[in-house]
């Protein structure tokens, strides 16, 4: 065959769709797809972890283990972690209250309020990084939370403050048999 009809998901360029990709008339025959779509080359490592190693279920966690293994072989590697000095635990200027119903199950809940965010498509580099680890990009806000989750291993969630009833977030376990709407808009 001299060609192929495919969707963006079949060549790692987007979420699963029912349609096919139609290239513009200026697409040159023989040009590698990575050049046409400006896809950067990357190496993806698939790592199997045992359930007791949740500390290693992130990019930084894997890097920490890799550093320890290489340093034991004579290397002198150091980790450079981002500064968190601006995220003081003493900052109480949020207008949102947090109530933890079971502190034995959730001893700490923290949040940051960021204002004047324009929800839009993520930049291409972020979309490609998420797609490379099997996550479909949604928008800049959701994509940043997913990126940080995989970077540091800490689950995040973004809330629209105008949608929080009573300016209060309540952390609790679900009651037996209760249902709720998940982020994919399904009742579970």
What are these regions (language model features)?
Residues 1-188:
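RNA/tRNA-interacting regions in translation and RNA-turnover enzymes
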């Amino acid at each position: 065959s001299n060609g192929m009809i495919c969707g963006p998901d079949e060549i790692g360029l987007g979420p699963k769709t029912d349609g096919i990709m139609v290239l513009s008339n200026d697409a040159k025959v023989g040009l590698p797809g990575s050049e046409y779509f400006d896809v950067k080359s990357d190496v993806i490592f698939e790592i199997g972890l045992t359930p007791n190693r949740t500390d290693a279920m992130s990019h930084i966690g894997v890097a920490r283990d890799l550093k320890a293994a290489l340093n034991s072989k004579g290397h002198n590697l150091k980790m450079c972690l981002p500064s968190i000095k601006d995220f003081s635990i003493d900052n109480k200027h949020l207008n949102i209250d947090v109530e933890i119903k079971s502190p034995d199950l959730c001893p700490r809940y923290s949040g940051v309020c960021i204002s004047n965010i324009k929800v839009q498509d993520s930049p291409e580099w972020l979309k490609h990084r998420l797609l490379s680890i099997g996550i479909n990009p949604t928008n800049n806000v959701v994509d940043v939370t997913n990126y940080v989750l995989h970077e540091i291993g800490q689950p995040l969630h973004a809330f629209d403050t105008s949608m929080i009833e009573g300016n209060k977030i309540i952390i609790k376990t679900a009651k037996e048999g209760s249902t709720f709407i998940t982020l994919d808009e399904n009742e579970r």
